Amino acid sequence: MSTTTAEMSTIDEQADSPLLTGPIFKQFCFLAIPTILGMVINGLYTFVDALFISQGIGAQAMGAVSAVFPIQMILIAISTMLGSGMASLVSRYLGAKRQKDADEVFSASFMLAILSALLLCTLTYLNLNSIFSLLAVPESLQAQASSYITPIVMFWVIGFICNQITEGFRASGNPKAMMQVLSTASILNILLDALFIFVFEWGVAGAAWATICALSIALVIAIQLQSKGESAVKFQRRSLLSPVQVHLKMLSLGLPVLLSHGGFSVILAATVYSISTVFAQNSEPLITAHGILVRCYMFLFLPIIGMMVALQTLAGFNYGAGEFERVKKAYLVACLISTVWGVIVTFILCLNAHWLIALFTSDALVTELGKEIALVAFAGFTTAGFCMMSSGLFQGMGKAIPATMLDAARTYVLLLPLMVTLPNLYGSDALWWSFPIADVAGGVFALSFSIFTLNRLIKKN
């Protein structure tokens, strides 16, 4: 197989990449800080969106959006799975100087993303009423819930495509381009939210249309950046119909992300269902309080996701180059920094939830219920970074099975069973204790398993 001059130039640049030679802490921060900033700016719209809905429309509208939020999250989870699986392969191929393979994977991911989006969104749209029944969405919230989720479902294919391009930037070691796209989408979303909700008075549908319009403009910007060479991988039309094995690799490597993000959606759905059935008398204010706390949690969790994304890229590059000691150092640095952030977030959510909720609503019942939930549910957040960093580590190394196992262990082996058993054994309020127990147990297991695996890898080589 011949190698072109352009490919040789790219290979030489990768061999001299500071990701393979520079100080681990510095390189981790180089990748993490822009990614975190981009995610925080991008995630700000989720926080502000909830704020505008609560203040501009009302607490009931916030409850309606919260009730169907699991649907939106599962769409995001599947999109993220495809992008993360592609990025894991691309970063390892670039680290191993396999430019042609990296280009092929990047290009093939678009066909998989578009087909997945069309199929998933069509099925969801056709079965919305059944999904409402499955989630036990209160009848009083269903009309507004439908107004919000319908535009999201109809046009989320835009989000799938945009995500593939930005993940390509990230896998190339260019998080600044990724941040530019995500930041633009977030800022536009906030501005359009204000316009559609407060000026045009479109209600909860305005929040949904603001998201779709902002994503559309962000996609145009992402395409422009890609065409200008901001990514180390190039789109090749002939690779759209790549062998099935290429798509299967992406799916297998992205599966841990689906289990993690999808697990979050399942937990949200299970919580909404539990509130609607176990706490029937206070279901609406509880769903609203829980929805507000979830938005705050998601915003404060974004730095940990950014660290995981940075670790995945750094570990992928060094693993592909055979630098296993650097892989371990990167993992330990990521765990340390994420733990520090976890302590800060635990303090904010557990001890200061009342002022966070007060930003969204003046309803005394919603505020009191939110304080009671937060004090218990977020007590184990300090260890949350261990699971995420371990998942990012194994994804970067291309080891789908351990990454999948670690994500599944916390959510499906620990949390969901605890959510079912604890309320039956100790009463309805015990539901909230499921979260810190699963966080601590899952985090300790993930940390121990990851260090054991890395030590064995280093010893063998």
Model regions and ranges:
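Small-residue hotspots at the loop-to-helix junctions and early N-terminal turns
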Residues: 59-70, 146-149, 208, 284-299, ...
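Membrane-helix interface/capping residues of multi-pass secondary transporters
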Residues: 50, 59-62, 99, 128, ...
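Transmembrane helical elements of multi-pass membrane transporters/channels
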Residues: 30-49, 151, 185, 214-218, ...
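Short alpha-helical transmembrane segments in multi-pass integral membrane proteins
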Residues: 1-32, 90-157, 188, 199-255, ...
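Small-residue-rich hydrophobic transmembrane alpha-helices
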Residues: 62-122, 159-178, 272, 290-347, ...
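Helix-terminus/linker motif at the lipid-water interface of multi-pass membrane proteins
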Residues: 44-62, 132-139, 195-202, 262-293, ...
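Short runs within selected transmembrane alpha-helices of multi-pass transporters and secretion channels
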Residues: 83, 152-170, 178-186, 207-222, ...
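Residue-level signal for short hydrophobic patches within transmembrane helices
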Residues: 21, 25-44, 48, 71-78, ...
